[in-house]
């Protein structure tokens, strides 16, 4: 197989023409490929595939990441806030979807909905793109296109703007999900889990060499998850089918391809309403106020390929492409008004369908070079993304009246309907980028970079009954996004860092002339100290940040102070500042932790109030620890954790819903029965705290957190 290492490199020109196919695995060849181990060829490069998968290195920590850097870099050398969630951590916590994981990740806030349909926030802003192996696609909670974790080796999370490689993403940052890779030797596993509310999870994962010399390798993962929770009728069935292959085309050329197909079949819930004064209902946590006929169905097929080449005289080039096809339909019933003193409210019905065809492409080249007696590095490249979608909608504002204390979800059936509108939207962006890491002195690295972007948006809304159309277009040419950072090594283990990053976010709101508003512009300044301890097995970070969001669309008013319908001005400003502390990895040989604290202060300087900011707690703490009782019982692990937040709220039309601060405790036991067999038992919300994880309006989206619940699991590994 081809192994990439960090060395000095030269420029290359690459071309790619790939076709995707997946052959049946051939485990018997593993013994033959083992004899080839001594023939491994080492070439010099710095690509994604030069990093060992986290499932091989084990534990809760890795020493490097690619998110926000394009080429792998040590966490200590990236001048931004990075968290990497490893395969061990994901499996031990029984996470199925990325939004489940986010609920326990330091610095992130999840606006819960159905698992796989929740919004994820960082520093007050929602992640609106997710990367697979570095290539983006939209992340839209309501459409259910968040990837599951069965096919994922690790999740890399960056907080704060990522304008150099994601110039039109939100200010919160970027999430990069690195997919599992084929193994050279035959290996595999089967996992089964069962828990409260008839939750269950089944997974089979196998991989190995597909020819005698190990130059063709494959892997296949299939998983089914039924993620029910305490809410009646709220079924949530997810399927994942993943196949990937790697081809050593030569000693220095690696081709990788994958197909990822996912399905979701959900009976959705929008939570509970509240009383008109914002006080919450006193009802069972299992209360469901939708229709038993409600349904959400989604199918997503993701195809990707990457070609990497390294030359003995230096230089690594990579070309990657990704295509995603997503198809979703939703029929949902939910409350549409505050509850009166007798428990009465109304129901509304909404239907929606969404089709997406998203493509992304990236070509980059990286090289180390000597400067002033030290090794510096640059990366240059180009990328392109195109997001095309059609969305059909229908809404019946009030088609039934109910009493929340005496309601039968089977009494309401799906009404007859036809879609009333279709929105066709195409977004595209072409970018050129470059970044140089200048190692001017042995302890000092200065990072400079810039991106030039060309952006186009076309949106057409059609009234289906009449065929009437209204269109919006917007474009930006040659938009420059700068980037700067510095890392100063205090010692081999500790480094100070600082960075400045920027993004611009196009808006669809229009001014009084019918023109789209100029883009929002986000700027962030961040500084802190990072440490890599115990030979990189423990990573810590302390950081402070200041983020400014300008040109936000705000309601326009006439001279009399009366709001002008459908008219906005780019006058909104928000300033966010905060502190983050994090420790990830081994505290001792047998003791691991994933711990973080975040303070977030959001100040809306001008413009309209954004209620989502109220829902971000000022203080949040996430702690998890795992201890191997090797001195007492070999193979026995005990785990425990706490998530704690200060109060949060949601205000609309002068009415506020509120949840006070709380702390939740979880526990786990894991026992390695043999080298190949493992049993687990997890307890969540150990003390059965009753709380609203999400607060919304008086109409909907007030959602109870899960009561105390358990999950038992068993894994068998083939070696």
Report the location of each language-model feature:
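Face-selective signature of the C-terminal outer-membrane beta-barrel domain
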Residues: 303-326, 348-462
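Acidic/polar loop-and-plug regions of large Gram-negative outer-membrane beta-barrel proteins
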Residues: 225-229, 242-310, 323-356, 399-425, ...
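Structural signature of Gram-negative outer-membrane beta-barrels, strongest in the C-terminal barrel
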Residues: 246-250, 260, 356, 375-377, ...
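C-terminal beta-signal and adjacent terminal beta-strands/loops
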Residues: 643-651, 670-719
């Amino acid at each position: 197989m081809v192994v990439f290492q960090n060395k000095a490199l030269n420029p290359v020109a690459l071309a790619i023409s790939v076709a995707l196919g997946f052959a049946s695995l051939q485990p018997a060849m593993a013994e033959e490929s083992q004899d080839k181990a001594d023939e491994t060829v080492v070439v010099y490069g710095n690509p994604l595939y030069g990093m060992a998968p986290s499932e091989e290195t084990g534990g809760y920590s890795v020493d490097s990441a690619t998110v926000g850097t394009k080429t792998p870099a040590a966490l200590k050398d990236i001048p931004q806030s990075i968290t990497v969630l490893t395969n061990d951590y994901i499996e031990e916590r029984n996470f199925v979807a990325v939004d489940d994981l986010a609920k326990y990740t330091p610095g992130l806030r999840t606006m819960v909905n159905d698992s796989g349909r929740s919004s994820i926030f960082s520093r007050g802003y929602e992640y609106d793109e997710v990367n697979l192996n570095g290539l983006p696609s939209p992340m839209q909670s309501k459409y259910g296109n968040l990837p599951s974790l069965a096919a994922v080796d690790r999740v890399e999370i960056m907080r704060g703007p990522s304008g150099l490689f994601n110039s039109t993403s939100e200010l919160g940052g970027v999430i990069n999900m690195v997919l599992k890779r084929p193994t050279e030797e035959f290996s595999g596993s089967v996992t089964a889990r069962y828990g409260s509310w008839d939750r269950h999870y089944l997974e089979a994962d196998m991989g190995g060499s597909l020819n005698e010399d190990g130059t063709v390798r494959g892997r296949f993962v299939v998983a089914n998850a039924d993620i029910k929770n305490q809410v009646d009728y709220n079924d949530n069935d997810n399927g994942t089918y993943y196949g990937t292959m790697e081809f050593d085309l030569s000693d220095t050329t690696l081709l990788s391809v994958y197909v990822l197909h996912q399905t979701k079949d959900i009976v959705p819930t929008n939570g509970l309403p509240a009383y008109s004064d914002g006080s919450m209902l006193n009802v069972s946590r299992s209360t469901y106020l939708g229709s038993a006929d409600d349904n959400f169905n989604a199918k997503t097929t993701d195809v990707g390929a990457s070609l990497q080449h390294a030359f003995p005289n230096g230089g690594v080039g990579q070309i990657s492409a990704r295509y995603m096809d997503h198809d979703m339909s939703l029929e949902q019933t939910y409350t549409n008004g505050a509850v009166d003193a007798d428990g009465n409210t109304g129901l509304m019905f909404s239907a929606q369908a969404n089709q997406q065809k998203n493509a992304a492409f990236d070509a980059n080249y990286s090289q180390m070079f000597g400067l002033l007696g030290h090794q510096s590095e640059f990366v240059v490249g180009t990328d392109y993304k195109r997001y095309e979608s059609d969305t059909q909608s229908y809404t019946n504002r009030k088609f039934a009246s109910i009493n929340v204390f005496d309601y039968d979800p089977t009494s309401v059936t799906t009404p007859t309907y036809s879609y009333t509108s279709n929105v066709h939207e195409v977004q595209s962006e072409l970018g050129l980028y470059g970044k140089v890491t200048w190692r001017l002195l042995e302890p000092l690295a200065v990072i400079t970079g810039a991106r030039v972007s060309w952006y186009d948006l076309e949106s057409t809304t059609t009234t289906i009954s009449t065929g009437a159309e209204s269109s919006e277009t917007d474009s930006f040419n040659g938009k420059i996004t700068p980037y700067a950072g510095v890392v100063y090594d205090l010692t081999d283990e500790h480094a100070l860092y600082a960075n400045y990053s920027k993004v611009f976010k196009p808006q669809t709101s229009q001014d009084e002339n019918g023109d789209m508003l100029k883009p929002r512009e986000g700027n962030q300044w961040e500084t802190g100290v990072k440490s890599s301890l115990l030979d990189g097995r423990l990573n810590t970070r302390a950081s402070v940040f200041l983020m400014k969001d300008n040109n936000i669309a705000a309601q326009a008013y006439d001279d009399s102070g009366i709001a002008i319908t459908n008219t906005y001005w780019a006058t909104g400003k928000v300033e966010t500042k905060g502190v983050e502390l994090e420790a990830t990895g081994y505290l001792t040989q047998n003791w691991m932790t994933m711990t973080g604290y975040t303070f977030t202060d959001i100040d809306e300087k001008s413009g309209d109030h954004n209620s989502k900011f109220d829902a971000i707690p000022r203080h949040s703490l996430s702690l998890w620890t795992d201890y191997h009782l090797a001195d007492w019982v070999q193979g026995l692990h005990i785990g425990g954790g706490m998530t704690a937040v200060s109060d949060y709220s949601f205000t609309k039309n002068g009415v506020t819903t509120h949840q006070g601060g709380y702390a939740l405790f979880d526990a786990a036991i894991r026992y390695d029965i043999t080298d190949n067999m493992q049993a687990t038992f997890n307890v969540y919300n150990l003390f059965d705290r009753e709380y609203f994880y999400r607060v919304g309006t008086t109409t909907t989206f007030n959602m109870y957190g899960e009561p105390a619940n358990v999950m038992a699991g068993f894994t068998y590994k083939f070696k």
